[in-house]
């Protein structure tokens, strides 16, 4: 009986010790959690004094940066006009000449066409001739007006066109007046043509012949039409 009572007392003592240990551990956990929450609140919610101090420092920094940038830009803007004044003083005469040239080109926009004239077709046999008097302006530096050679060029062009027409008419009349030998050759070629019309031509020769017909007379290159003449003695 005594042994049983002793064991019960020991069991009660051990149970009390375990309960105290568990309660102490729970209290320590609760304390640590409370400390963590307090630290977290302090980090996430800073005080108003800290916020004001940081915002004031940033505002002061921004004001200083803006003042420095404005001062540097004003210094650059002060330096640039001085350089521009120097350049305009040095190149004043050159700019005047450029203005005169620009005014001239505005009045005569077809200067390059008159200077580099294309080849003019004189007759259907592709004979060409260029103008001998190009249109070249002369810029006067003494402030006088620009002098050009427009009037002599126009008169020379009219004379050239008249001479071209006369020459083309003369050559055309010369070509129409054939000699007896040429007439005989033409008759002979007509006979050859009639003879070869009996045969079937290849497709390549047909296309070449059609292309030659479609071409205009002033695009033709002058060639001797009597270079190769076949001799057919018997038909």
Swiss-Prot record:
Record localization: Secreted
Tissue-wise expression: Mammary gland specific. Secreted in milk.
Stretches with biased composition (Polar residues): 144-158
Keyword Phosphoprotein: yes
One Pfam family of this chain: Casein
Keywords for the protein's UniProt record, in alphabetical order: Milk protein, Phosphoprotein, Secreted, Signal
Region Disordered, annotated ranges: 144-163
Gene Ontology terms for molecular function: protein homodimerization activity; zymogen binding
InterPro entries recorded: Alpha-s2_casein, Casein, Casein_CS
Signal peptide region: 1-15
GO cellular component assignments: extracellular space
Residues bearing PTM Phosphoserine: 23-25, 28, 47, 72-74, 77, 147, 149, 168
Residue ranges of the TM segments: none
Reported function: Important role in the capacity of milk to transport calcium phosphate.
Family the UniProt entry places it in: Belongs to the alpha-casein family.
Protein name per its UniProtKB record: Alpha-S2-casein
Organism listed in the record: Sus scrofa
